[in-house]
């Protein structure tokens, strides 16, 4: 969250499933409101429907905040990385979802090497350009009511399942 709050020019997060905590989501909104270019590179193909739909339940809010969403089309995405201003990066096994962060006890490294961060940012930009489809606010707004309802129900189910664990208060 500190890296997102310190961002000045660009934030790029890449992961299959994006179900962030309210704190992370609000930090992304604050960054976008400051004029930071915030981009998400997310799974385009459905591997696990519940997580995929729950991630998509946030698209309306994210797009409305000016956050760009790119869905990876080349195959299943297993990257879990992020770069802030080419000076801070995270790399590891955790998606930004409650199961990765709380239940599965996955972890990410924090890297502050400018060369590494710049290279990672360039690689992500290449993937976005070559292997992704950008989701636009206008295209998303035209999705059917059933489409949107399925995503909202999936998100609520994820958080309901989380509430059955001892980790609910931590997310």
Tell me the role of every PLM-derived stretch:
Residues 7-13, 17-171:
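PLD/PLD-like phosphodiesterase catalytic module centered on the HKD motif
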């Amino acid at each position: 969250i500190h890296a997102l709050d310190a961002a000045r020019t660009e934030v790029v997060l890449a992961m299959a499933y994006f179900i962030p905590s309210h704190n992370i989501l609000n930090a992304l909104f604050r960054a976008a409101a400051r004029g930071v270019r915030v981009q998400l590179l997310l799974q385009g193909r459905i591997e696990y429907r519940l997580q995929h739909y729950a991630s998509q339940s946030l698209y309306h809010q994210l797009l409305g905040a000016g956050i760009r969403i790119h869905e990876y089309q080349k195959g299943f995405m297993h990257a879990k990385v992020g770069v802030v201003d080419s000076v801070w990066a995270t790399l590891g096994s955790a998606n930004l979802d409650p199961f990765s962060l709380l239940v599965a006890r996955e972890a990410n490294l924090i890297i502050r090497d400018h060369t590494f961060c710049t290279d990672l940012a360039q690689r992500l930009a290449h993937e976005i350009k070559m292997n992704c489809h950008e989701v636009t606010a206008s295209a998303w707004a035209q999705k059917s009511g059933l489409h949107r309802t399925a995503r909202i129900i999936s998100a609520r189910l994820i958080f309901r399942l989380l509430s059955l664990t001892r980790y609910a208060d931590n997310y």
